[in-house]
């Protein structure tokens, strides 16, 4: 049994065929595909272990009534808490979410523009983003580099300025920065954000190392401002 065979069997079981008249029927869930795959005669290889984890952890629902598209799901604030999962499960879930999100994003037309401003459809906040960036997710890089056209923004929050440079230098895709207090920033870190020729690098260095809570430097394009954030309790 292959993954493709499991998918085709799940669709056949749901009564969905090449006949367009069947395409409005509820599609099989990912959980059903997982079950179909494991029902077959499969080798206990890497793919098997992944599908076994998906089944054991019950990652997906088997109720089609609970299924919506990714962009429908993101019409309200959603928080994905992966704290209790093992690293391999975290990586699997994040990879699936990013891949599905990117595929749906590409199906959208470009977001509207008016008076030089672009419509924002969805914002994604990734906390402790260094954990994702070092995992080399192709979809993460593509969402960051292509998302603006589709009205998708992404905020990558991390503790260190050098975290954005893994095998892939994510800083090259980022146009806006908000830098709070950072421990031991280097001149090269600042140069990668503000530009090596910026005459104010030493001033930025001093400000960042001495900034108190809610103080930061904001860089939007070529404009740099010292700002005081408005706390949530105000």
Regions found by a protein language model. Name each.
Residues 85, 129, 159-161, 182-183:
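An acidic- and aromatic-residue-enriched active-site/binding cleft used to recognize and process polar
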Residues 149-152, 157-163, 181:
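Conserved H-loop
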Residues 78-80, 155, 176-178:
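Hydrophobic/aromatic beta-strand patches that form the interior of the parallel beta-sheet core
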Residues 1-152, 165-168, 206-223:
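P-loop NTPase motor domains
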Residues 55-61, 155-159, 194-198:
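A short linear-motif detector with a strong N-terminal bias
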Residues 162, 168-234:
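P-loop NTPase motor core of the ASCE superfamily
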């Amino acid at each position: 049994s292959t993954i493709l065979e499991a998918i085709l069997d799940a669709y056949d079981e749901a009564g969905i065929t090449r006949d367009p008249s069947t395409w409005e029927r509820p599609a099989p869930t990912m959980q059903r595909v997982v079950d179909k795959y494991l029902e077959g005669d499969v080798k206990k290889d890497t793919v098997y272990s992944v599908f076994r984890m998906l089944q054991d952890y019950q990652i997906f629902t088997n109720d089609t009534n609970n299924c919506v598209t990714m962009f429908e799901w993101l019409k309200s604030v959603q928080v994905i808490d992966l704290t209790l999962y093992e690293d391999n499960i975290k990586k699997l879930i994040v990879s699936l979410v990013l891949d599905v999100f990117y595929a749906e994003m590409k199906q959208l037309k470009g977001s509207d523009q008016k008076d030089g401003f672009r419509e924002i459809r969805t914002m994604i906040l990734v906390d402790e983003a260094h954990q994702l960036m070092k995992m080399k997710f192709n979809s993460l890089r593509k969402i960051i580099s292509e998302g603006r056209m589709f009205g998708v923004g992404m905020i990558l929050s991390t503790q260190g300025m050098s975290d954005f440079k893994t095998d892939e230098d994510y800083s090259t895709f980022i146009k806006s920065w908000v830098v709070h207090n950072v421990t031991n920033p280097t001149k090269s870190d600042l140069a990668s954000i503000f530009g090596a020729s910026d005459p104010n690098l030493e001033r930025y260095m001093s400000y960042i190392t001495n900034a108190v809570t809610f103080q930061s430097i904001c860089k939007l394009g070529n404009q740099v401002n010292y700002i005081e954030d408005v706390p949530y309790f105000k």
